[in-house]
Amino acid sequence: VLSVIKFKTEEEVISLANDTRHGLAAGIFSKSNSRCLRLSKAIHSGIVWVNTYRVVSPIAEFGGFKNSGYGRESGFQAIYDYTRPKTVWMNMSDEPASNPFVMK
């Protein structure tokens, strides 16, 4: 199903696109790259496809805005949901650190 809506100004189409409780995805088709960039920044959705639709990749984050969900799936950020990052600083020399508050 494809929904096509006529509009006269970019402000009008942004208002129409954002006038919903949901914001999972949007698709923009235009010959103007600058228009696509402006619209993709202004539309409140978790993913925006430009001159294509439903292209996915496991390294791209996926998730919505508003009532379409909180958080993201996939992508590098998802790895952090399953890990506990920890920083360990270790003196590898045989000498004790001269001042533990000075990083070398």
Which role fits each region the language model picked out?
Residues V1-K104:
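Conserved C-terminal structural/oligomerization subdomain of aldehyde/semialdehyde dehydrogenase
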